[in-house]
Amino acid sequence: MAAQGFLLIVTFLLVLMVLARPLGSGLARLINDIPLPGTTGVERVLFRVLGVSGLEMNWKQYLSAILGLNMLGLAVLFFMLLGQHYLPLNPQQLPGLSWDLALNTAVSFVTNTNWQSYSGETTLSYFSQMAGLTVQNFLSAASGIAVIFALIRAFTRQSMSTLGNAWVDLLRITLWVLAPVALLIALFFIQQGALQNFLPYQSVTTVEGAQQLLPMGPVASQEAIKMLGTNGGGFFNANSSHPFENPTALTNFVQMLAIFVIPTALCFAFGEVAGERRQGRMLLWAMSVIFVICVGVVMWAEVQGNPHLLALGADSSINMEGKESRFGVLVSSLFAVVTTAASCGAVIAMHDSFTALGGMVPMWLMQIGEVVFGGVGSGLYGMMLFVLLAVFIAGLMIGRTPEYLGKKIDVREMKLTALAILVTPTLVLMGAALAMMTDAGRSAMLNPGPHGFSEVLYAVSSAANNNGSAFAGLSANSPFWNCLLAFCMFVGRFGVIIPVMAIAGSLVSKKSQPASSGTLPTHGPLFVGLLIGTVLLVGALTFIPALALGPVAEYLS
């Protein structure tokens, strides 16, 4: 079992790096404002039709464009969900959503969280799934990538005030990165057996002679961008454990690769644009070390079996509760870490049924900000915040003004960095406390004791960090939970983007200083260790007390 797990991890990472390297080169061209070959004419026509000037923006203008697009998308999606019974492509005549569920769902998909307090096949029409959720899957992913484009330019430009044009970046990211790759993945999913149709639900006779209603729909097209954009919201309630979404072991492997390929490619792109590929490799080493350790811990915990079943005398040599027999324990463990290290949240197993330690690792990966590869764009700009913090700590230790890529990190940048890092922990801890203090919060818990608290802590951690996965024992479709989680998702997304863009605006105006004998190298194993230590230290200091009340207490009980 150990050899199989090791081979699975190594194979996954090797294939990932092979795919991400050329994609990173293409992203580097876009960051450097170099059109991809053969796209100039199409872009010129589109820019003219859409009225995009192409003039570069300062950080406030860039941020305003990103926020404006997302707020417009939020309003459109909210009213679309409220009135879906008036809209076409609704063969099951599904009614509109309640105001609180519509608000929660709209915020969820606009913020790239894709938390779902509903069952897709019984709640949403084909039109809502396609024109509403799938569109936001593209736009939210493009928004995250555009923000990291701006931040990378801030590190590599000197004495400037502009960070690029947000509309140009969003169009290029959507047209030349997300759309073509998602199309290829969708076609592959269809070939493997995923659904893609507009048929009414089909009534079939099972082998036992009973009648069953099989849901239909345009699944493959949504599934592709759901994984590629690290969105995670499933067409069906069972998400990627449903055979209509994820029909084979091969599609499952491709889904895991799709989650990580853009975050990995962005690290390569960062190294290329910075003119020092070692900087990108340093980030990948730090992410990979944490990732491999976390996968190993989850695999170890799940192959030990469920101690509660063992205590009852049941056969539990491995913990198969809540897992697809098609995939097994090792693949389910790898998928769980992939989906929570990134801001994806898609699942092929029920995280609520993992062992105490097996469920704690995905929860902790979200709580540290999903900086281990992370979401498209958001993972890298989250890790860059920890890079700045690590540089600052190192500067204090050696008595020098901290600098990164030749740019001095001053008080303003550190205040903004601290603010951005503290946004999500504050939301998680205060949100969990509020839920536990109120009857409306506690009544949603399926389980009592430490595991019930873990369900609450996981839900708020998932929402605040824009992941979207859940310990499904929590009955979250209530006005209290829909509003609480919507607030956490909204502030967790834009409360980080705003200070990140402010940091970019500050850094882009600075000159790069040449390296000297006293400059801290930020590309070697020493800095990789310092960066990992910073991530672990912040995560440990912030969340160990809360984790001790949940999964740790459950493990020890």
UniProtKB/Swiss-Prot annotation:
It is found in: Cell inner membrane. PANTHER family: POTASSIUM-TRANSPORTING ATPASE A CHAIN, POTASSIUM-TRANSPORTING ATPASE POTASSIUM-BINDING SUBUNIT. Pfam families: KdpA. Keywords: Cell inner membrane, Cell membrane, Ion transport, Membrane, Potassium, Potassium transport, Transmembrane, Transmembrane helix, Transport. The lineage of its organism: Bacteria, Pseudomonadati, Pseudomonadota, Gammaproteobacteria, Enterobacterales. It is a multi-pass membrane protein. One of its GO terms (cellular component) is plasma membrane. The system is composed of three essential subunits: KdpA, KdpB and KdpC. This is Potassium-transporting ATPase potassium-binding subunit. One of its GO terms (molecular function) is P-type potassium transmembrane transporter activity. The chain crosses the membrane at residues 5-25, 63-83, 132-152, 170-190, 253-273, 283-303, 329-349, 356-376, 379-399, 416-436, 484-504, 526-546. Belongs to the KdpA family. The keyword Transmembrane helix applies. InterPro entries: KdpA.
